[in-house]
């Protein structure tokens, strides 16, 4: 079957009535509902029209904003942890932490337990004293199990000798630096003994020098005169010993 070029490019007037009715279907025109009129076709899929696509710049900006929010929240949490305060602990101006408690066995007098390098150490010292006096009724900074185990590990501490447990713990904490003090006192005593021995030896040597010096004896008109040559070295020794 052959088609002529004229038949392929025929005018629209030569279309059949069925083709015209298909193109000009009334259902594809305006919606007849009471809503504002808009172009509507029942066979068209409008699902894609409800999705909005953002540009890459907008997506990056939102991610940066979300990251800044999360970072600020983390910084706030870290600041809260660093500024945490413990019961019975006070920070000293030079950076140390002091622990103190009111001794209920001594009419509530305030007792200074000691100074510590870390706030946690001072808080544990307070918990030990509070638990030793009040038991499970005490308000602690750390769990009861932790405080009980720390008391068991402490040596040479008798909390039940009839006195105040708070004072016993205070004496224990004050003994932490005692070995250093003993070492210093022993070193100072040894240095003083060394200095005294040096001074005694210098004095004996000076006397021996003076005794070994020859004396000049001169007799004039029945009078005996003795002259001793002290020397410059003996004079310097006397000046040093007098200072």
Swiss-Prot record:
Q: Tell me, using the record's free text, what induces this protein.
A: Weakly induced by Pseudomonas syringae tomato (avirulent avrRpt2 strain), but also by mock inoculation.
Q: Which SMART domains match?
A: AP2
SUPFAM superfamilies to which the protein is assigned, alphabetical: DNA-binding domain
Compositional bias segments (type: Low complexity): 186-212
Gene Ontology CC terms, in alphabetical order: nucleus
Q: Where in the cell is it found?
A: Nucleus
- Please provide the record's keywords in A-Z order: Activator, DNA-binding, Ethylene signaling pathway, Nucleus, Plant defense, Transcription, Transcription regulation
Which parts of the sequence form the motif Nuclear localization signal?
170-186
What the record says about family reads: Belongs to the AP2/ERF transcription factor family. ERF subfamily.
Query: What does this chain do?
Result: May act as a transcriptional activator. Binds to the GCC-box pathogenesis-related promoter element. Involved in the regulation of gene expression by stress factors and by components of stress signal transduction pathways.
Question: This chain belongs to which protein, by name?
Answer: Ethylene-responsive transcription factor 15
- In its UniProt entry, the species of origin is given as Arabidopsis thaliana
């Amino acid at each position: 079957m052959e088609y002529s070029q004229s038949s392929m490019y025929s005018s629209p007037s030569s279309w059949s009535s069925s083709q015209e009715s298909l193109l000009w279907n009334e259902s594809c025109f305006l919606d007849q509902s009471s809503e504002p009129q808009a172009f509507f076709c029942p066979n068209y899929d409008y699902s894609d029209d409800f999705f909005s696509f953002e540009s890459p710049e907008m997506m990056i900006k939102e991610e940066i904003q979300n990251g800044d929010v999360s970072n600020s929240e983390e910084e706030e949490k870290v600041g809260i942890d660093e500024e945490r305060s413990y019961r019975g602990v006070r920070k000293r101006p030079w950076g140390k932490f002091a622990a103190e408690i009111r001794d209920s066995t001594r009419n509530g007098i305030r007792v200074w337990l000691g100074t510590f390098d870390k706030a946690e150490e001072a808080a544990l010292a307070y918990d030990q004293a509070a638990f030793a006096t009040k038991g499970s009724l005490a308000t602690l900074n750390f769990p009861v199990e932790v405080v009980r185990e720390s008391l068991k590990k402490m040596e040479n501490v008798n909390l039940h000798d009839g006195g105040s447990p708070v004072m016993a713990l205070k004496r224990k904490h004050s003994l932490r630096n005692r070995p250093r003090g003993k070492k210093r006192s022993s070193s100072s005593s040894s240095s003083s003994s060394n200095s005294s021995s040096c001074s005694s030896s210098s004095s004996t040597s000076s006397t021996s020098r003076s005794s070994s010096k020859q004396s000049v004896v001169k007799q004039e008109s029945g009078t005996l005169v003795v002259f001793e040559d002290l020397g410059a070295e003996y004079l310097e020794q006397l000046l040093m010993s007098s200072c």
